Design a protein with these regions (language model features):
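Non-catalytic accessory segments flanking enzyme active sites
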Residues: 31-136, 147, 226-279, 324-325, ...
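Beta-propeller blade signature
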Residues: 97-99, 159-163, 204-209, 253-256, ...
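Hydrophobic beta-strand positions that form the internal "hydrophobic ladder"
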Residues: 81, 144-146, 189, 239, ...
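Active-site-proximal cap/loop segments of hydrolase catalytic domains
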Residues: 489-703
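A flexible loop/linker signature enriched in serine peptidases of the S9 family
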Residues: 86-93, 124-129, 148-157, 172-175, ...
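Blade-edge beta-strand/turn elements of extracellular beta-propeller
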Residues: 114, 120, 162-175, 210-222, ...
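Cap/lid segment of the alpha/beta-hydrolase catalytic domain
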Residues: 117-138, 147-153, 164-169, 402-406, ...
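Long hydrophobic segments that form regular secondary structure
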Residues: 221-310, 314-320, 324, 332, ...
Length: 721
């Protein structure tokens, strides 16, 4: 049992006594805190000792399905093909490129002429944690700006590599964040710094060959609700400085050919108006929710006068379709949309005067699947690179000729061991929420796993930040399916699966809708005979961990086991403290309990930590990261301590803290697979499922998606997983 030291906090005439507030130490290296976390780790290891053989078996299965030595699909940018390689036994990818042969549009097929840009295994050395943030070449492709984090705290050190020699230049910049851009002169580099609360708030300019101390501060975002980012338009003509809160945005642009010039605003910020842009032939295409376009619309404006007074509708608002983003090509406009809860891609012909031609949605092979944009850095191309996956179809990369509508499969994620998709079935079920809304559950199971109240079911949820949990493939998950599990995703409100209103109906003073939707999905699965409470497990991470914690308090008898990864569970404590990382940004998501007594009372009503009661809770596995800047370690640590002291059952309650990592968990792929094996072993043991896969599944069948290439996008928001 953890030591109790009651401390009180008063807000809106309400006093809260917290016996474990001492765990929120000023220094995460506080000896007592570390001793407690290490003791919990030891307890978890001892409690899971009976599953050690099962964990090894699961790890072997997960690893055995992976083509460990593999190659990502090369991406053409300018005179080079870019790709990443993985090697058997190596934790991290190796980022490479090869020169493109003039007139040959085919991707390279061997290693002849390969140039290693960055070998993460070499750079990581003996570091317990290693993550790459920036990976950005100059327009002439001679210098690579790259950054690394060796703690998991998401503070990156920026370096610059001469790609001809393979050596890093003397320039080095510590304390940077996500977001970079190069000027057209190949010498001027823009980067972002966070403040002490980890809010990215300053744009800086560096010139190659100079000291970081000589760098120029270009812009500071003074509004604590906003974070700052930088990038370039696809044609690399404009640098784009973006400032965003949860509900409002503003963009400034600067000609990349004039990198020391002054950024100019596109449209000044207006509360609750969001927009983002791309450049095309002296015009900006702008995705926005202005003028009541709840699900967003597309407008255009001249690049020299891009303000709202000059916006012209291109694709009007559609209540049934959410416009999530766009890509632009010389002769085509690509719209990334969401309809009926699923992602789709629409291709629109584009005339020289920006006139729209015929449009069509790219056909997909299954009723329940997910299409997503790929890496498309080339503006003058008629070929769209995109990805597709479903819960039974491994991640697939296609090239799509937007004129002929012909698609070419470039690669499907290899699943070793004889995986046969026909042995599995994916489907959608429709659960009725308390207020009559319909929640579309995505499910996958073995084809021979029929409806059965004894079936073990794992129900996953998130439900915050308008993030969407799409039905995609996981080869690791096969280890559960082959043991008879049914896996289901509950896309509850607060997420973005069904459009913008789906999000707004699950935030602020409607946050409890997220939890009631999730419980409605659980009740539906039970009522329809798919499982029973003792065989129903739930899982969620970060804000999804809040979901898990809240529903365990509201209906602990509804679930047979739970996994909460880096869970956001000390909600009131975190959101009251404006000095904590990212808190002020979060007020537009959760509400501001400092100013509003109504928000405070509502938030306190669902806070997982404050609503623990002396009752039985199901077996629970909780994870944390000592260096986590998004959900600090003390949130899951306090939650577990209070649960252990209060609950009345003897069910397992386990806390596993990564002592050298942050929010994203361990950085190496083998370490991540071992963590997944631990979670699966816990679920199998807690639900009393056979530890052996059913031989009727056939031979045991890469874990997650293929390694992202150098043009991967930035990570999600503050409490996202």
């Amino acid at each position: 049992m953890a030591r109790q030291e009651p401390r009180s906090r008063r807000c809106h005439d309400d006093e809260v006594v917290d016996p474990y507030a001492w765990m929120r130490a000023a220094d995460k290296d506080d000896p007592e805190v570390r001793a407690y976390l290490e003791a919990e780790n030891a307890w978890t290891e001892a409690a899971m000792a009976n599953t050690s053989q099962l964990q090894e078996q699961l790890f072997g299965e997960i690893k055995g399905r992976i083509k460990e030595t593999d190659l990502s699909v090369p991406v053409r940018k300018g005179a080079w093909w870019y790709y990443s390689r993985t090697l058997e036994g190596a934790q991290y990818p190796i980022h490479c490129r090869k020169p493109a042969v003039q007139g040959d549009e085919r991707a390279p097929g061997d290693e002849v002429g390969e140039q290693v840009m960055l070998d993460q295994n070499v750079e990581a050395g003996d570091a317990e944690f290693f993550a790459v943030g920036a990976f950005d070449t100059t327009p002439d492709a001679r210098v690579l700006a790259w950054s690394s984090d060796t703690e998991g705290d998401e503070l990156y050190t920026m370096r610059f590599r001469d790609l001809a020699s393979g050596e890093d230049l003397p320039d080095e910049i510590a304390g940077t964040y996500y977001g970079t851009a190069w000027g057209a002169d190949n010498q001027t580099f823009f980067y972002v710094r966070p403040d002490e609360a980890m809010r990215p708030y300053q744009l800086w300019r560096h010139r190659l060959g100079t000291q970081a101390s000589d760098d120029v501060l270009v812009h500071t975002e003074d509004d604590d609700r906003f974070f700052l980012g930088v990038g370039t338009t696809k044609d690399e003509r404009f640098l784009v400085l973006g400032m965003e809160s949860k509900v409002t945005s503003e963009a400034w642009v600067l000609e990349a050919s004039d990198p020391t010039g002054t950024f100019r605003v596109v449209e000044p910020r207006h509360q609750d108006v969001e927009y983002g842009l791309e450049h095309w032939n002296d015009r900006f295409f702008i995705v926005t929710n202005a003028d009541g376009a709840e699900n967003f619309k597309l407008v255009s404006a001249p690049a020299d006068s891009p303000g709202r007074d000059h916006w012209t509708d291109v694709v009007t608002h559609r209540p049934e379709v959410k416009l999530s983003g766009i890509d632009v090509f010389a002769g085509h406009l690509v719209l990334f949309e969401r309809a009926e809860g699923l992602r789709q891609i629409r291709v629109q012909a584009l005339g020289a005067d920006a006139a729209l031609g015929d449009d069509h949605v790219i056909d997909q092979p299954e009723m329940v699947g997910s299409a997503s944009g790929g890496a498309n850095p080339e503006f003058d191309s008629r070929v769209l690179r995109y990805g597709y996956s479903s819960m039974v179809t491994p991640s697939s990369v296609f090239d799509y000729d937007m004129d002929t509508r012909q698609r070419t499969l470039l690669k499907r994620q290899p699943v070793l061991g004889g995986y046969d998709s026909d042995r599995y079935v994916t489907e959608r079920l429709w659960a009725m929420a308390d207020d009559g809304a319909v929640v579309p559950i995505s499910m996958v199971r073995r084809a021979d796993r029929l409806r059965d109240i004894t079936a073990p079911v794992l129900l996953y949820g998130y439900g915050s930040y308008e993030a969407s949990m799409d039905p995609t493939f996981s080869s690791a998950r096969l280890s559960l399916l082959d043991r008879g599990f049914v896996f289901a995703i509950a896309p509850v409100r607060g997420g973005g699966e069904m459009g913008r209103r789906w999000y707004t109906e699950g935030k602020l003073l409607a946050k409890c809708t997220t939890f009631s939707d999730f419980m409605a999905c659980a009740h539906y699965l039970i009522e329809q005979g798919w499982t029973s409470p003792s065989r129903l497990a739930i899982r969620g991470g970060s804000a999804g961990g809040l979901l898990v914690g809240a529903v365990l308090n509201m209906a602990p008898g509804l679930f047979g086991a739970a996994v909460a990864e880096v869970p956001f569970v000390d909600v009131v404590e975190a959101i009251l403290d404006a000095a904590l990382p990212l808190t002020v940004l979060e007020w537009e998501e959760w509400g501001n309990p400092v100013e509003s007594a109504e928000v405070y009372a509502y938030m306190k009503g669902y806070d997982p930590y404050l609503n623990i009661e002396a009752r039985e809770y199901p077996p629970l596995l909780v994870t944390a990261g000592i260096n986590d800047p998004r959900v600090p370690y003390w949130q899951p640590a306090k939650w577990v301590a209070r649960l252990r002291a209060t609950k009345t059952d003897s069910n397992p309650l386990l806390l596993k803290t990564e002592m050298g990592a942050g929010h994203m968990g361990p950085s190496g792929r083998y370490d991540a697979w071992r963590d997944e094996a631990l979670v699966y072993a816990f679920l199998i043991d807690a639900l009393g499922v056979s530890s052996l896969p059913d031989p009727a599944a056939g031979p045991l069948s890469p874990f997650g998606d293929p390694t992202p290439g150098p043009f991967a996008s930035d990570p999600p928001g503050p409490f996202a997983s």
